[in-house]
Design a protein with these regions (language model features):
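Short beta-strand/loop segment at the start of cytosolic alpha/beta domains
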Residues: 1-18
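Amphipathic alpha-helical interaction surfaces in cytosolic regulatory modules
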Residues: 19-92
């Protein structure tokens, strides 16, 4: 299960999606909808991964697709390890 909370950041002109649980299976499609619906026209999108406990291949592919356009914060050690290839691939460019 994945819980997705939305917090607008009026001062910064962006928004934060806070995730709790597993980014996997059907929840990846739900996350994509939330991301597309909440992505600001102007400003930055931040995704808070503090309470993410698992990311499957579909979840990693989603983060790989959006990573250049978002800031990922508060990664647990587990999530950070799973996302290392995504971050390395984009930071190397």
């Amino acid at each position: 299960m994945l819980r997705i909370s939305y917090e607008p950041q009026r001062a910064a002109g962006g928004s934060v999606l806070k995730l709790e649980g597993q980014v996997s299976g059907r929840w990846v499609a739900e996350l994509r909808r939330a991301y597309d619906d909440r992505r600001p026209a102007v400003g930055a999108m931040t995704i808070d991964l503090r309470d993410v406990t698992f990311i499957d291949r579909a979840g990693i592919a989603f983060f790989d697709e959006i990573y250049p356009d978002v800031t990922l914060i508060n990664c647990s050690l587990f999530a950070a390890e799973q996302l290392k290839p995504v971050i390395a691939r984009h930071d190397a460019v």
